[in-house]
């Protein structure tokens, strides 16, 4: 079967992620990478993460912590963000807040929302390679 006949035309513009190629370099033991947005694992607050994990999975709400949730994000976190925004004079509601799993997901959502067919996107130079990949996928 000729898969090109059934795939969306945007697939012709898609290519391997530059970030994925950069990450392959990290497998080399003599490389100290300053690219790719990879933080030093020694800086991770692992003990704080462990305590938060244990607290979250204790008690009667443990099952809810592992369950699927609304796509907008965890409502108590969105409510907390609303309160924090109000403290600095920015009015909003939880419906104005969208929690993403990271910058890449946010960029893909923005690209879906903002890029029209044959539209133009301006970026600075140098720019985040992940943004180019997210934007390039849309007409």
Description of each model-found segment:
Residues 1-71:
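N-terminal "arm"/small-domain region of PLP-dependent enzymes with the aminotransferase-like
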């Amino acid at each position: 079967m000729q898969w090109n006949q059934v795939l969306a035309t945007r697939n012709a513009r898609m290519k391997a992620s530059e970030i994925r190629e950069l990450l392959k370099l990290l497998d080399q033991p003599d490389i100290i990478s300053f690219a790719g947005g990879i933080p030093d694992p020694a800086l991770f607050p692992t003990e704080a993460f462990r305590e938060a994990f244990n607290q979250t999975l204790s008690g009667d709400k443990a099952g809810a912590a592992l369950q699927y949730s609304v796509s907008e994000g965890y409502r108590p976190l969105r409510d907390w963000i609303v309160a924090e925004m109000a403290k600095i004079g920015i009015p909003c509601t939880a419906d104005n807040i969208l929690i993403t799993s990271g910058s890449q997901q946010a960029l893909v959502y923005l690209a879906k929302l903002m890029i029209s067919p044959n539209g133009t996107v301006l970026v600075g130079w140098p720019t985040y390679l992940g943004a180019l990949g997210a934007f390039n996928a849309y007409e």
